[in-house]
Amino acid sequence: MTGNLVIIAAAAVLSCACVFVLIRRAAQLGLVQAPEARSSHVRPTPTGGGIGIVAGALVAGLSLPGTDGISFLILALGLVIALVGLIDDRRPLPARVRLPVQALVVAALLWSTGAAGALAGGLPPVFHLGAAVLLLIGVLWWINLFNFMDGIDGIAGQQAILMLLSAMLIAFGTVPGVTGGWTWWMMAATAAATFGFLVFNWPPARIFMGDAGSTFLGFTLFASAMLSLVAGWLSLPQWLVLAALFAGDATVTLLVRLLRGENVAQAHR
């Protein structure tokens, strides 16, 4: 366990170091975000700080004991999500490019982990396809939700840490031997890497996650949920409760704007 704790601490330090460098090199890398309607900042602010989260989490994930084929696949899929986000940070990609890639990544995760079958197992076969489509849409919404909320100082990082630590504590208190597996420690590593970034994202934020970090974090949270569901650690209702406040806030906001006849595709504060 001591070795795992060292890896977790290293994830936080690596993330913090990456963000520190990015703040100073953001202009050279084309990673500066001008103030916009949805953001809480009033002057150009570096973005792409989520690269630190990605680096810390991936290095830790590869270093933790118990890494297997599924673990490697999840890390690789997370890297794909992050790379698409990084490209979008530097040169905005249209939704018709981003969403299909994200959908393929999510589909690969659901298929490889067996999560789709676990979630639809109680439904009659005739409903399986419809349930899969709804699940895919919901996951895409969840992944992009983190990007949607990244404009508010600290909120996305705090939510991710809260969800991960809460899930870890629930599993620790109810599942014997849960700390012997890769998934539990990977959740800890992701939380630690997020904390390393949050040091610089705390109000007033010196840097934002950007698409690279926010979409990676949304995907990693979903992957953690799927792995824990398949393993029987946590139930779907428990994860929905953990995500309810964050997802509900953004969803209700968009619904209210839609009912008012506003353009929900246009950013707002």
Predicted features by range, described:
Residues T2-T251:
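"…together with the soluble PPM/PP2C metallo-phosphatase catalytic core" -> "…together
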Residues L242-R269:
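Membrane-proximal soluble regions of multi-pass membrane proteins
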